[in-house]
Amino acid sequence: MIGMLTGRVESVETDTALIDVGGVGYEVRMSATDLSRLHAGQDTRVFTYMNLSQDAITLHGFLDRDAKKTFLQLIKVSGIGPKVAQSLLSTLTPSQLAHAIADNDATALAKAPGLGKKGAQKIILELKGSIDLSQIEGASAQAATSKSPVDTGTEQVVEGLISLGWRQQDAQQAVAEACAENDIPTPLATDDVPRVLRLALALMDRGR
């Protein structure tokens, strides 16, 4: 089983990143949140989960151990597969997910594409009491102090798209794709923010 990849980002697509590890390219499915933090040419470390099915072998990737741990808990819930689990992580952070479960907030969970209210209620029923909030928040705080500085430029673009009525997940995917297609490095420079906003809007207007 492949538990972690360390290499260089070859490309970033709508829902995957291609990671070059010693000349071998691994296609890794990732959340929109994580993809927005990657760009071509960047060195990265990705924690992975290998999903084996009759049709394919799929690698799911996470930039933080905390996100992977949350993913593994989600796919233990009956009826929740890797695709929906990753959709949840594109919509809410691990800490937000944990709080939604602890607070019986099915509405917050149901915002994830592909889940629905019944699926959200099932997650709460099966996981409530099994998630340690203090552990998740402690890990998130530690990750925040050790990772690269916050990409405020990307945040500005995403917030701008949200203010225009787009969903957060779609906005994050559009920004990641715009940067990848036009070789725009991240974290975004202040001067690149207007350009990326225009490019992301153009992508979304084409039917993303």
UniProtKB/Swiss-Prot annotation:
Keywords recorded for this protein, A-Z: Cytoplasm, DNA damage, DNA recombination, DNA repair, DNA-binding
GO molecular function, one term: four-way junction DNA binding
One Gene Ontology term, aspect cellular component: Holliday junction helicase complex
Main location: cytoplasm
Region feature Domain III, mapped onto this chain: 151-208
Chain segments carrying region Domain II: 64-142
Subcellular locations according to the entry: Cytoplasm
Disulfide topology: none
Region (Flexible linker): 143-151
Protein's name according to its UniProt entry: Holliday junction branch migration complex subunit RuvA
GO biological process entries: DNA recombination; DNA repair
Family annotation (InterPro entries): DNA_helicase_Holl-junc_RuvA_I, Hlx-hairpin-Hlx_DNA-bd_motif, NA-bd_OB-fold, RuvA, RuvA_2-like, RuvA_C, RuvA_C_sf
Subunit field text: Homotetramer. Forms an RuvA(8)-RuvB(12)-Holliday junction (HJ) complex. HJ DNA is sandwiched between 2 RuvA tetramers; dsDNA enters through RuvA and exits via RuvB. An RuvB hexamer assembles on each DNA strand where it exits the tetramer. Each RuvB hexamer is contacted by two RuvA subunits (via domain III) on 2 adjacent RuvB subunits; this complex drives branch migration. In the full resolvosome a probable DNA-RuvA(4)-RuvB(12)-RuvC(2) complex forms which resolves the HJ.
Listed Pfam families: HHH_5 (PF14520), RuvA_C (PF07499), RuvA_N (PF01330)
Family: Belongs to the RuvA family.
HAMAP family linked: DNA_HJ_migration_RuvA
Role summary: The RuvA-RuvB-RuvC complex processes Holliday junction (HJ) DNA during genetic recombination and DNA repair, while the RuvA-RuvB complex plays an important role in the rescue of blocked DNA replication forks via replication fork reversal (RFR). RuvA specifically binds to HJ cruciform DNA, conferring on it an open structure. The RuvB hexamer acts as an ATP-dependent pump, pulling dsDNA into and through the RuvAB complex. HJ branch migration allows RuvC to scan DNA until it finds its consensus sequence, where it cleaves and resolves the cruciform DNA.
Record text about domains: Has three domains with a flexible linker between the domains II and III and assumes an 'L' shape. Domain III is highly mobile and contacts RuvB.
Region (Domain I): 1-63
